[in-house]
């Protein structure tokens, strides 16, 4: 394995560090090496992607080189780039992330699309999110639907701290947070929309997922330590207490057989207005139930 002691340059240009970093990451098995080194470099130098090649011959300060080398070293140890830089983008918003919260995924933007479309014609809709994490879902909905009143729940105080920071950073004022264990209790009130990206990886599958996910992302946000359906049963049992008549429940689902297994939980309980919605790759990733 190559290490950061190899190929130490005394004088670095943008080109040099892209070339060196890309080769180092490639040699350590990272297939998206160029994209990742550009991502880190943009964050470090406060560049937009287009700025990189407009400044390809510019020299980089010694302190920035030192920082970037440390970041690459962390990446070689499989730490996700988003945790290294401390942020990512979701639905056009910059979202701070830490190992206390799940890294927002592009496929979850489809969940937000469906939610916004569902409540777009409602006045002052009440929205409940279960599983705040970084707050990205509530922030995206709250930004798009400014008259919505959103309550976002999480069992983790550390996650809620990150989410509150993100709402402040994105100037979102219509989201409130509450610490609550949804598997043990439910919030008061009725909502026009309940939305969640719950832990849906089973205790068997969690052992097989990518190392950078398994090693660094919070297990509580990934798996229910059961069959991956515990939260869906909990929603099914309580949905009529939580949602107004003609309201909706929107849930992200996993891959493989998981979407149909989640669908069956609600169908076998008598719910008829159920829809599985594909993401932009054509995979069924959103489950919508109308009450």
What do the PLM-derived regions correspond to, one by one?
Residues 226-289:
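Conserved Class I SAM-dependent methyltransferase catalytic core
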Residues 40, 78, 108, 137, ...:
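Residue-level signal for inorganic ion chemistry
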């Amino acid at each position: 394995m190559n290490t950061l002691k190899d190929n130490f340059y005394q004088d670095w240009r943008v080109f040099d560090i892209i070339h060196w970093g890309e080769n180092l990451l490639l040699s350590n098995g990272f297939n998206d090496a160029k994209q990742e080194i550009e991502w880190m470099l943009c964050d470090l130098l406060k560049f937009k992607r287009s700025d990189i090649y407009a400044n390809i011959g510019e020299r980089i300060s010694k302190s920035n080189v030192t920082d970037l080398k440390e970041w690459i070293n962390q990446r070689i140890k499989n730490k996700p780039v988003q945790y290294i830089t401390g942020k990512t983008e979701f639905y056009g918003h910059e979202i701070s992330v830490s190992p206390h919260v799940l890294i927002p995924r592009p496929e979850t933007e489809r969940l937000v699309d469906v939610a916004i479309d569902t409540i777009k014609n409602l006045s002052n809709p009440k929205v409940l999110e279960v599983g705040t994490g970084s707050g990205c879902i509530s922030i995206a909905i709250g930004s798009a639907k400014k008259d919505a009143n959103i309550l976002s729940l999480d069992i983790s105080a550390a996650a809620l701290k990150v989410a509150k920071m993100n709402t402040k950073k994105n100037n979102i004022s219509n989201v409130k947070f509450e610490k609550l264990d949804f598997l043990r209790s439910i919030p008061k009130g009725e909502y026009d929309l309940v939305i969640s990206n719950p832990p849906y990886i089973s205790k068997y599958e969690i052992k097989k997922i990518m190392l950078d996910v398994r090693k660094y992302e919070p297990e509580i946000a990934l798996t229910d330590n059961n069959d991956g359906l515990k939260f869906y049963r909990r929603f099914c049992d309580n949905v009529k207490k939580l949602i107004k008549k003609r309201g909706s429940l929107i849930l992200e689902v996993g891959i493989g057989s998981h979407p149909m297994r989640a669908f069956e939980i609600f169908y076998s309980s008598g719910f008829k207005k159920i829809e599985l919605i594909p993401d932009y790759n054509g995979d069924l990733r959103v489950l919508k139930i109308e009450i």
